[in-house]
Regions:
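Active-site helix/loop of acyl-thioester processing domains in fatty-acid/polyketide metabolism
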Residues: 118-137
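N-terminal accessory segment detector
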Residues: 1-120, 139-153, 157-163
Protein backbone atom coordinates (compact mmCIF):
# COMPACT_ATOMS: atom_id res chain seq x y z
CA UNK A 1 0.00 0.00 0.00
CA UNK A 2 3.11 2.20 -0.04
CA UNK A 3 2.22 3.42 -3.52
CA UNK A 4 -0.87 5.19 -2.15
CA UNK A 5 0.64 8.61 -1.58
CA UNK A 6 -1.23 11.68 -0.47
CA UNK A 7 0.19 13.70 -3.36
CA UNK A 8 -1.41 11.35 -5.89
CA UNK A 9 -4.85 11.64 -4.37
CA UNK A 10 -6.87 14.44 -5.98
CA UNK A 11 -8.32 16.93 -3.52
CA UNK A 12 -12.12 17.00 -3.67
CA UNK A 13 -14.48 19.36 -1.97
CA UNK A 14 -17.43 16.97 -2.27
CA UNK A 15 -17.77 13.22 -2.53
CA UNK A 16 -20.89 11.49 -3.76
CA UNK A 17 -21.63 9.21 -0.80
CA UNK A 18 -24.26 7.24 -2.71
CA UNK A 19 -21.64 6.29 -5.31
CA UNK A 20 -18.98 5.55 -2.68
CA UNK A 21 -21.35 3.39 -0.63
CA UNK A 22 -22.46 1.49 -3.74
CA UNK A 23 -18.84 0.71 -4.68
CA UNK A 24 -17.98 -0.27 -1.11
CA UNK A 25 -21.12 -2.42 -0.97
CA UNK A 26 -20.15 -4.31 -4.14
CA UNK A 27 -16.58 -4.84 -2.96
CA UNK A 28 -17.69 -6.16 0.44
CA UNK A 29 -20.39 -8.32 -1.14
CA UNK A 30 -17.92 -9.90 -3.59
CA UNK A 31 -15.37 -10.47 -0.83
CA UNK A 32 -18.00 -12.10 1.40
CA UNK A 33 -19.20 -14.27 -1.50
CA UNK A 34 -15.65 -15.52 -2.05
CA UNK A 35 -14.41 -15.77 1.56
CA UNK A 36 -17.58 -16.19 3.63
CA UNK A 37 -17.11 -15.43 7.32
CA UNK A 38 -13.35 -15.31 6.72
CA UNK A 39 -13.85 -11.98 4.94
CA UNK A 40 -13.80 -10.14 8.27
CA UNK A 41 -10.17 -11.16 8.75
CA UNK A 42 -9.32 -9.63 5.36
CA UNK A 43 -10.99 -6.29 6.10
CA UNK A 44 -9.79 -5.59 9.65
CA UNK A 45 -7.01 -3.32 8.35
CA UNK A 46 -9.35 -1.05 6.36
CA UNK A 47 -9.15 2.42 7.87
CA UNK A 48 -6.17 1.85 10.13
CA UNK A 49 -2.58 2.78 9.21
CA UNK A 50 -3.51 3.97 5.72
CA UNK A 51 -5.88 6.61 7.11
CA UNK A 52 -3.45 7.68 9.83
CA UNK A 53 -0.56 7.94 7.36
CA UNK A 54 -2.67 9.85 4.85
CA UNK A 55 -3.93 12.42 7.38
CA UNK A 56 -0.85 12.73 9.64
CA UNK A 57 0.08 16.12 8.14
CA UNK A 58 -3.38 17.37 9.11
CA UNK A 59 -2.86 16.41 12.74
CA UNK A 60 -4.29 12.89 12.99
CA UNK A 61 -2.04 11.18 15.50
CA UNK A 62 -2.71 8.67 18.23
CA UNK A 63 -1.32 8.58 21.75
CA UNK A 64 0.60 5.61 23.07
CA UNK A 65 -0.73 6.28 26.56
CA UNK A 66 -4.49 6.81 26.57
CA UNK A 67 -7.17 4.90 24.70
CA UNK A 68 -9.69 7.52 25.88
CA UNK A 69 -7.66 10.30 24.26
CA UNK A 70 -7.48 8.20 21.08
CA UNK A 71 -11.25 7.68 21.18
CA UNK A 72 -11.72 11.43 21.29
CA UNK A 73 -9.21 12.01 18.47
CA UNK A 74 -10.85 9.34 16.34
CA UNK A 75 -14.33 10.71 17.03
CA UNK A 76 -13.29 14.28 16.29
CA UNK A 77 -11.51 13.29 13.07
CA UNK A 78 -14.44 11.22 11.78
CA UNK A 79 -16.87 14.03 12.65
CA UNK A 80 -14.71 16.63 10.89
CA UNK A 81 -14.59 14.41 7.81
CA UNK A 82 -18.39 14.10 7.82
CA UNK A 83 -18.25 10.31 8.29
CA UNK A 84 -20.14 10.08 11.61
CA UNK A 85 -22.02 12.31 14.04
CA UNK A 86 -20.72 10.64 17.20
CA UNK A 87 -18.63 7.77 18.57
CA UNK A 88 -18.69 6.57 22.15
CA UNK A 89 -17.01 3.62 23.81
CA UNK A 90 -16.49 1.91 27.13
CA UNK A 91 -13.87 -0.76 27.73
CA UNK A 92 -14.24 -3.27 30.56
CA UNK A 93 -12.55 -6.64 31.02
CA UNK A 94 -10.89 -6.48 27.58
CA UNK A 95 -14.23 -5.93 25.87
CA UNK A 96 -15.12 -2.67 24.15
CA UNK A 97 -18.70 -1.60 23.53
CA UNK A 98 -18.67 0.99 20.75
CA UNK A 99 -21.60 3.04 19.48
CA UNK A 100 -21.29 4.92 16.20
CA UNK A 101 -24.10 7.31 15.39
CA UNK A 102 -25.23 8.53 11.95
CA UNK A 103 -22.42 6.95 9.91
CA UNK A 104 -22.43 7.61 6.16
CA UNK A 105 -22.00 3.85 5.63
CA UNK A 106 -25.38 2.90 7.17
CA UNK A 107 -27.08 2.84 3.71
CA UNK A 108 -24.35 0.49 2.46
CA UNK A 109 -24.92 -1.79 5.45
CA UNK A 110 -28.64 -1.86 4.59
CA UNK A 111 -27.79 -2.94 1.03
CA UNK A 112 -25.60 -5.75 2.39
CA UNK A 113 -28.35 -6.80 4.80
CA UNK A 114 -30.82 -6.94 1.88
CA UNK A 115 -28.44 -9.34 0.11
CA UNK A 116 -28.23 -11.45 3.30
CA UNK A 117 -24.61 -10.47 3.92
CA UNK A 118 -24.14 -9.99 7.67
CA UNK A 119 -22.19 -6.94 8.86
CA UNK A 120 -18.58 -7.99 9.16
CA UNK A 121 -16.46 -4.85 8.98
CA UNK A 122 -16.67 -1.25 10.16
CA UNK A 123 -14.11 1.22 8.85
CA UNK A 124 -14.71 3.85 11.59
CA UNK A 125 -14.39 1.13 14.26
CA UNK A 126 -11.18 -0.10 12.60
CA UNK A 127 -9.65 3.38 12.96
CA UNK A 128 -10.69 3.44 16.63
CA UNK A 129 -9.23 -0.08 17.06
CA UNK A 130 -5.90 1.24 15.79
CA UNK A 131 -5.98 3.92 18.49
CA UNK A 132 -6.76 1.32 21.16
CA UNK A 133 -3.93 -0.90 19.92
CA UNK A 134 -1.47 2.03 20.02
CA UNK A 135 -2.42 2.95 23.60
CA UNK A 136 -2.81 -0.49 25.16
CA UNK A 137 -0.31 -2.61 23.24
CA UNK A 138 -3.08 -5.17 22.78
CA UNK A 139 -4.52 -6.60 19.59
CA UNK A 140 -8.18 -6.06 18.74
CA UNK A 141 -10.85 -8.00 16.94
CA UNK A 142 -14.34 -6.89 16.03
CA UNK A 143 -16.52 -9.70 17.38
CA UNK A 144 -19.99 -8.39 16.60
CA UNK A 145 -21.64 -5.58 14.66
CA UNK A 146 -25.30 -4.68 15.08
CA UNK A 147 -26.52 -2.17 12.53
CA UNK A 148 -29.48 0.08 13.11
CA UNK A 149 -31.28 2.86 11.31
CA UNK A 150 -29.34 5.63 13.08
CA UNK A 151 -26.51 3.87 14.92
CA UNK A 152 -24.37 0.77 15.00
CA UNK A 153 -23.23 -1.11 18.08
CA UNK A 154 -19.89 -2.87 17.83
CA UNK A 155 -18.35 -5.32 20.27
CA UNK A 156 -14.57 -5.35 20.05
CA UNK A 157 -12.32 -7.75 21.95
CA UNK A 158 -8.86 -6.82 23.21
CA UNK A 159 -6.24 -9.49 23.71
CA UNK A 160 -2.54 -9.86 24.31
CA UNK A 161 -0.82 -11.58 21.42
CA UNK A 162 1.27 -14.50 22.62
CA UNK A 163 4.82 -14.96 21.32
Amino acid sequence: MDNLKKETMPERTHMNTKYANLMLFRLLEVLYDSKGKGAKFRTCILGKEDIVDHYRDEGLQFSTESWEENRDRCRDFLKEQGIIEDLSCNIENNEAEITIESCIHIPMEEMLKNEEVPPYTCIPANLFAYGVERATGKQTEIAKIETGKDACKIKMLLFQEED
